[in-house]
């Protein structure tokens, strides 16, 4: 074998699937699987069997094409170690950097408000239904839970980060186990309600509107955009020098594809299992009660007449505890991102970017007071969580995940090779449909 053949053979071997690629596949998957998944079955099952089947068809393309578009934007910067802010500044100047900072902050902060409402409702329903305790004042419960989390964050942030990383896989495993455990309780209610002669495509409860609103919850639930920039930087540093940018782009696409398949398989199986256990009417009731599907399942098993099996009792309590842990995990993870983003905005606009004018402790205190204060106000007001996701959380995520990369493809020379592709149209349409939810909610 010649020296050239040896080099090619060596590079081919080294460029094949690596352990780090598996690690990142699982990392992207784990980032997306959080408390948002607990609301997806409610919206997906709200309209019955046909809309959720259509969402099943759309799930993988939404997860894969949208995140691949964002990854391509991150890959387009000249500096392999440059994050998304640096890349956007390179393409659009300092103004672009400010815009992306605002987008990141406002993409994450509403999620904290959503989790503030969710954890309050989940705790109160667990307290009243599973523990059979008298009802508590909502404002007090929300304040107590937020102060508890603020205390943990303030005095044990490093420990909390470690705990969060350990909780990812037990949470995913518990979702799969619950999905499997619900199979003995499946019924045909959702199938019996399908009336092909009386299907409405349009209108408030029509299939098209239900799927349209479902797209926003899919964008929210299938979202690992916060980690895409770090993922791309890691892969560029690992592969680009030896194998080139095109190879790195293909590798990133391959990893995103596998993570998306895992994510869709787990979340859709969970959604179908919940829907076959409950019914569209139950899902509507869960939406009205403003609680995640696991809390509703716990109440459902608590209300079973007659002697309950040990399994049903375990599921009743386990579902609520898993929901609480999932929301705590998601809250802490998003809090750290919100704190970092708000610190950056306060530093940029309050202190003109001069880090010497303010201590990190003071900066953290200012940001924490705003974050926890605004979260308490929203948690006390108790807006409908799905409406909040559809009107705020998902549209802002879509602007970052879908529309920003599409705009960059049209304007940035380094992304010109991606112009005119059909998948660009798909990503743009998904982004616009998600943002148009705001208009639907207003009118």
From Swiss-Prot:
Lineage: superkingdom: Bacteria
Protein name as it appears in the record: Threonine/serine transporter TdcC
InterPro entries in the cross-refs: Amino_acid_transport_2 (IPR018227), Hydroxy_aa_transpt (IPR004694), Thr/Ser_transpt_TdcC (IPR023726)
Membrane topology qualifier: Multi-pass membrane protein
Keywords: Amino-acid transport, Cell inner membrane, Cell membrane, Membrane, Symport, Transmembrane, Transmembrane helix, Transport
Recorded catalytic activity of this chain's protein: L-threonine(in) + H(+)(in) = L-threonine(out) + H(+)(out); L-serine(in) + H(+)(in) = L-serine(out) + H(+)(out)
UniProt KW Coiled coil keyword: no
Entry function: Involved in the import of threonine and serine into the cell, with the concomitant import of a proton (symport system).
Keyword Nucleus attributed: no
GO cellular component, one term: plasma membrane
GO molecular function: L-serine transmembrane transporter activity; symporter activity; threonine efflux transmembrane transporter activity
Membrane-spanning segments: 22-42, 44-64, 97-117, 140-160, 163-183, 207-227, 261-281, 319-339, 366-386, 389-409, 423-443
Assigned protein family: Belongs to the amino acid/polyamine transporter 2 family. SdaC/TdcC subfamily.
Compartment annotation: Cell inner membrane
NCBIfam families, per the entry: PRK13629.1, stp
Organism: Citrobacter koseri (strain ATCC BAA-895 / CDC 4225-83 / SGSC4696)
């Amino acid at each position: 074998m010649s020296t050239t053949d040896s080099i090619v053979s060596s590079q081919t071997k080294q460029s094949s699937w690596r352990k780090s690629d598996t690690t990142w596949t699982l990392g992207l998957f784990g980032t997306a699987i959080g408390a948002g998944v607990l609301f997806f079955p409610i919206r997906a099952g709200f309209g019955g069997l046909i809309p959720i089947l259509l969402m099943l068809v759309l799930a993988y393309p939404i997860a894969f094409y949208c995140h691949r578009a964002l990854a391509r934007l991150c890959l387009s910067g000249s500096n392999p170690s440059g994050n998304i802010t640096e890349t956007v500044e390179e393409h659009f100047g300092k103004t672009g950097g400010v815009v992306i900072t605002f987008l990141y902050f406002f993409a994450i902060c509403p999620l904290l408000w959503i989790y503030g409402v969710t954890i309050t409702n989940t705790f109160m329903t667990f307290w009243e239904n599973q523990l059979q305790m008298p009802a508590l004042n909502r404002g007090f419960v929300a304040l107590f839970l937020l102060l508890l989390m603020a205390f943990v964050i303030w005095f044990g942030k490093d420990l909390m980060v470690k705990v969060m990383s350990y909780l990812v896989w037990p949470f995913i495993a518990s979702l799969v186990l619950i999905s499997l455990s619900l199979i003995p309780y499946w019924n045909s209610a959702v199938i019996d309600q399908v009336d092909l002669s009386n299907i409405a495509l349009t209108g408030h409860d029509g299939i098209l509107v239900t799927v349209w609103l479902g797209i926003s919850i899919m964008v929210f639930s299938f979202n690992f955009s916060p980690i895409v920039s770090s993922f791309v930087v890691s892969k560029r540093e690992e592969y680009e020098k030896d194998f080139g940018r095109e190879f790195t782009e293909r590798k990133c696409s391959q990893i995103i594809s596998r993570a998306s398949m895992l994510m869709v398989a787990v979340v859709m199986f969970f959604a179908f299992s919940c829907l076959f256990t409950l019914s569209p009417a139950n899902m509507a009731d869960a939406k009205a009660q403003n609680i995640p599907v696991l809390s509703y399942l716990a109440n459902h098993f608590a209300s079973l007449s007659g002697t309950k099996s040990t399994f049903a009792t375990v599921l009743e309590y386990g579902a609520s505890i898993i929901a609480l842990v999932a929301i705590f995990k998601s809250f802490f993870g998003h809090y750290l991102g919100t704190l970092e983003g708000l610190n950056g905005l306060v530093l940029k606009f309050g202190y003109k970017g001069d880090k010497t004018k303010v201590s990190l402790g003071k900066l953290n205190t200012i940001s924490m007071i705003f974050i926890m204060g605004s979260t308490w106000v929203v948690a006390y007001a108790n807006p409908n969580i799905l409406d909040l996701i559809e009107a705020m959380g998902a549209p802002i995520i879509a602007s970052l995940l879908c529309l920003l990369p599409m705009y960059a493809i049209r304007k940035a020379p380094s992304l010109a090779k991606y112009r005119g592709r059909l998948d660009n149209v798909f990503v743009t349409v998904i982004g616009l449909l998600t943002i148009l939810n705001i208009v639907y909610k207003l009118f």
